């Protein structure tokens, strides 16, 4: 296979990583026990953003304190912490509580703070809500909206065949595009990690964007980035090459995500092998060198095939914006009431 053009090179010998100086967690904690990183302050009473350019930041939910929350079960673990399903003792409302031990490597800590800042300031029905956050005894606790339907990746695992039908994806697509349009146009944020496991669903069938740990906030909507973060398998070719990129990189990731959900498998498959990619670098070279995957015309509508092709343009300048894609025929092809994801979810089981 040909070596990818540009900055990307396969093989461990080509990798060079500059490791920045690590700061201890104590460098971020004041004498009063408040965690401060840049313009964000956290303590056991809650969160405060001390120099906010936006005036639209929602006030933290004053009805929530950590002592009012009781753990129901553990939902998952990762990034140096745990996510729990918790219930408010007095209102019986449920939340997802992300608890992170901040004595972790600085890069991960910065990502967590970045996620918190973005979530706390976001006001969009297509972005997971952050209700409150606290810092106490080395732990940051983030109170998030509980998406009880899991992720698109979770839903696919429970279906047979393990894929989401095109009409359902049409409804999903519209909601994700509305979320991306808000992030790109209003917040000037590149998500940088759109994938099935980061698109969450609730029992109403509402789809919301989550996990902003690697997102980039740009000074304006015309700016670009050149850092290499996110899930590599969903990266656009220009990101794999280490070049500059903008909001259009999220559009590539969306196209790849929708195609994976439709096919029931990751769209880039190794030629002549059913066992998956044996070499990670070969996959990245394929993303850079080979034509992008397409939706099979004998399995999907012309509108869906056209939408996927529009997203998976290797030249980022040729990809439409989220706002432009909202006018694509595929997005409004299917009725939201008839094809919402709520019908694919199992019945809700009452909490004990």
UniProtKB/Swiss-Prot annotation:
Annotated catalysed reactions: L-seryl-[protein] + ATP = O-phospho-L-seryl-[protein] + ADP + H(+); L-threonyl-[protein] + ATP = O-phospho-L-threonyl-[protein] + ADP + H(+); L-tyrosyl-[protein] + ATP = O-phospho-L-tyrosyl-[protein] + ADP + H(+)
Induction field: Slightly induced in response to chitosan.
Outline the extent of the Protein kinase domain.
69-331
For this entry, the protein name equals: Mitogen-activated protein kinase kinase 1a
User: What family is this protein classified in?
Assistant: Belongs to the protein kinase superfamily. STE Ser/Thr protein kinase family. MAP kinase kinase subfamily.
Corresponding gene?
A: MKK1a
- List, alphabetically, the GO terms of the cellular component aspect: cytoplasm
Pfam families tied to this protein: Pkinase (PF00069)
Cystine connections: none
For this protein, the record's Gene3D superfamilies field holds:
Phosphorylase Kinase, domain 1, Transferase(Phosphotransferase) domain 1
Top-rank lineage group of the source organism? Eukaryota
Q: Tell me which InterPro entries the record gives.
A: Kinase-like_dom_sf, Prot_kinase_dom, Protein_kinase_ATP_BS, Ser/Thr_kinase_AS
- Entry EC no(s): 2.7.12.2
The residues responsible for catalysis, as annotated, are 193 (proton acceptor)
The UniProt entry's GO biological process terms, in alphabetical order, are:
defense response; response to chitin
Annotated ATP binding lies at: 75-83, 98
Observed phenotype of the null mutant: Slighty reduced chitin-induced cell wall modification compared to wild-type. Modest reduction in chitin-induced MPK phosphorylation. The levels of mRNAs of the defense-related PAL4 and CHS are being less induced following chitin treatment.
UniProt function note: The CERK1, MEKK1a/b, MKK1a/b/c and MPK4a/b proteins are involved in pathogen defense. The pathway induces rapid growth inhibition, cell wall depositions and accumulation of defense-related transcripts. This protein is required for full defense response to fungal pathogen chitin.
**Catalytic class of the enzyme:** transferase
Q: Which GO terms of the molecular function aspect are on file?
A: ATP binding; MAP kinase kinase activity; protein serine kinase activity; protein serine/threonine kinase activity; protein tyrosine kinase activity
What PANTHER family is this protein classified in? DUAL SPECIFICITY MITOGEN-ACTIVATED PROTEIN KINASE KINASE 5-RELATED, MITOGEN-ACTIVATED PROTEIN KINASE KINASE 2-LIKE
